[in-house]
Regions:
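Glycine-rich phosphate-binding "P-loop"
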Residues: 1-8, 47-57
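Conserved interdomain linker/interface between the two RecA-like ATPase lobes of SF2 helicase motors
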Residues: 1-36, 138-140
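Conserved nucleotide-binding/hydrolysis micro-motifs of P-loop NTPases
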Residues: 2-3, 36-40, 61-63, 87-89, ...
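Short glycine-/polar-rich loops that comprise or flank the Walker A/P-loop
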Residues: 27-28, 50-53, 78, 93-97, ...
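Conserved helicase ATPase core of P-loop NTP-dependent helicases/translocases
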Residues: 42, 53-84
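C-terminal accessory/connector segments of nucleic-acid motor ATPases
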Residues: 73, 161-191
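Beta-edge loop/turn motif
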Residues: 74-95, 99-102, 120
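Conserved segment of the helicase C-terminal RecA-like domain
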Residues: 93, 104-153
Length: 191
């Protein structure tokens, strides 16, 4: 698949999804994951030129720009957010569809846990009845000695990796003090 044909596929999938509505009343919206800030803008601009309301979203944007995109997407004013791993975790967007433009983020393959977090952005139960995930690997594209289509199969067949959490007493105290000073914790029971 050439980059141009991938962009056309993304456009068709995003338009089709935006024309669907969940039983909970939300229109279908799409998150596209790609591997660089530059590509977020390139894909978003392509989609905008094809009459798809898309926005690039990455860590290099100002806080206010990111917040505006988040609010506009949440309100259904934007049908597509094209992002790096910046939206992989912790954001509860009303997306019904996730498209992987690339399985490389930055300069490494995404891990099974990252993949799980990213595909988990599609079909949030409070918004949609189902989630759809598309992988658009480039056949013949190798990275770090492995083809993208082989990596796609590995990720689809993988289980999440174990997570090991190490607690540092000093860091725990710092976090507790930060939570208290920001008033996110109001009672000792919440500690």
């Amino acid at each position: 698949r050439s980059e141009s044909s991938k962009h056309h596929i993304m456009q068709k999938l995003a338009k089709k999804e935006f024309n669907t509505k969940s039983k909970k009343g939300y229109r279908g919206q799409t998150i596209i994951f790609t591997n660089s800030r530059r590509k977020t803008h390139k894909i978003a601009n392509f989609l905008q030129n094809k009459k798809v309301n898309a926005a690039a979203y990455h860590a290099g944007l100002s806080y206010y720009k990111k917040e505006k995109i988040e609010k506009d997407f949440d309100r259904g004013k934007i049908s597509v957010v094209v992002t790096t791993a910046a939206l992989a975790a912790g954001v509860d967007f009303p997306a019904s569809q996730v498209i992987f433009d690339s399985l490389v983020m930055g300069n490494k393959w995404i891990s099974p846990n990252e993949f799980s977090q990213m595909l988990g952005r599609a079909g949030r139960p409070s918004y949609h009845d189902r989630g759809i995930v598309y992988l658009l690997p480039e056949v013949g594209h190798d990275f770090d000695g492995e083809s993208e289509e082989a990596k796609a199969l590995d990720l689809l067949e993988s289980d999440s990796e174990d997570v090991f959490i190490e607690y540092d007493e000093e860091s725990s105290y710092e976090q507790i003090l930060a939570d208290i000073s920001s008033r996110s914790i109001k009672t000792t029971d919440e500690l």
